Amino acid sequence: MLSFSCGIFLKGMIYMSITKTIFGKTSDGEKVYSYLLDNGNGLSAEILTYGGIIKNLYVTDKKGKKTDVVLGRDTLEDYLKNDGYLGALIGRHANRIARGQFELGGEKYSVGINEGHNSLHGGNIGFDQKVWSAKEKDAAEPSLELSIVSKDGEEGFPGKLDVTVTYTLTKENALKINYKAVSDKDTVVNMTNHSYFNLAGHASGTIDNQILQINSGFYTPNDNECMPTGEVLSVMGTPFDFRAPKPIGQDINSDFEQIEMFGGYDHNFAIAGRGYRKAAAAKCLENGITMEVYTDKPAMQLYTSNALPEGIYKGGERYNIHQAFCLETQYFPNAMAHSHYPSPILKKDEEYNFTTEYRFIVK
């Protein structure tokens, strides 16, 4: 495949680079590109213009081994099956909207139904299925800017939405994702990234023994459609108490009703504090990789890959239940139905601007 590369030397002879490669074509002939970002300090990420997917994310572990810590597929054809949202950008509205309906400014809106009776992750054709325009940013750190225009009425959402998402690898070994959007009408926006993490490596088996801490004292329980009931409950004395670090698998097979219903975790946590703060930290004891999550979003979904689509994944692997965990920073799911939840409303001409950062520490 044809590829293009550029690089920058920094102090201390750190060599950062961005390499562009043709990854494939969609069914209508639109080209999809891969951009490999390398910070020259042991962290690299491969980003696709299809869905803004993080295809690979390599972290150098304590033994010097490059470990790919995200699940994924090898080919565009596999990603086009739209299975599991692996590594993709999610929008306009991440997570669920009950019956695909909400009211805004006295008007009732119906958006795409794609999970039973409900809307999930933007509807039938969300941002995960778009081919994004890409621009390499002239910055001191390898950075890729992706953009799309979501038309007024697309998937039923009001307003023409101009969206920009920027991926940056910092010198301090963090993957930073900045989300920006502006609408010409009042609308709702709730964007995230749906990467599936396994800090031992994408093909290493379950994440049961990996350690997780979540900066949250409250979670939102779900009904049998995985839709929040509207309650906000204390994690104290439940399997949802990750305030102190514990193995992800410690309670994943618990008979606690909310765990049994979904075969693991698929729940929203209210992140303590305001502004840009630490939301979570995960660690693999075997290779010394720790991932810290920082965000200015109010909440985060923990999903423990309780059900993954069948088929062959990267490197010919077949992934199993609990092969990875997702930490999806977000507004609360179905927030428009509950006035006590933080509001995902974006007013006309105002800017939606949030950042989530995945910091990698090895020791």
What are these regions (language model features)?
Residues 12, 16-363:
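An exposed, glycine/acidic-rich loop-and-rim segment of catalytic or binding clefts
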Residues 1-15:
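Short, Lys/Arg-enriched N-terminal segments with co-localized hydrophobic residues
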